[in-house]
């Protein structure tokens, strides 16, 4: 399975869909496509399911698709966009990383607005140089942490914390009890 990207000239957006290719490279066909986008496909250890991230539900969420019947289930209700999906070897869990908003310290104390005054919007204080990839604004201060969620759906559980980021791949121990990552 691979991600096939295209540009929607009418909506000025990039779209990505999941396509499947045979092992000899001859047969390319859409596995999960539509007007929304899908990314980060990961096969379950038994090869019967595929986890991926899609915005079909309105925001970036984790979905699982059963390859034999084509059914797809939304398994998460996350506040931020997940990435770096990784199946546990027993197929019961999915690990992923996700941003957790950080508290930002103000460098100046704002004045109190007098009653009845009509002021402009408060200024945005930028303490980091993280901008949205689409150029539409500033990314709020956040740190990327490791989470797990049951592969059949449920509540996500945060495993790491602190003022540092976890980027890159996540790897499970063979007994599905530990996750290895770099911070």
PLM-predicted stretches and their roles:
Residues 1-3, 33-53, 71-72, 79-97, ...:
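Conserved beta-propeller blade repeats
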Residues 6-10, 56-59, 101-104:
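Short glycine/acidic-enriched loop and turn motifs that connect beta-strands
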Residues 14-17, 99-147:
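Predominantly five- to eight-bladed beta-propeller fold
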Residues 18-20, 62-64, 146-148:
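Hydrophobic beta-strand positions in blades of beta-propellers and related beta-sheet-rich domains
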Residues 19, 23, 27-29, 33:
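N-terminal accessory segment at the very beginning of proteins
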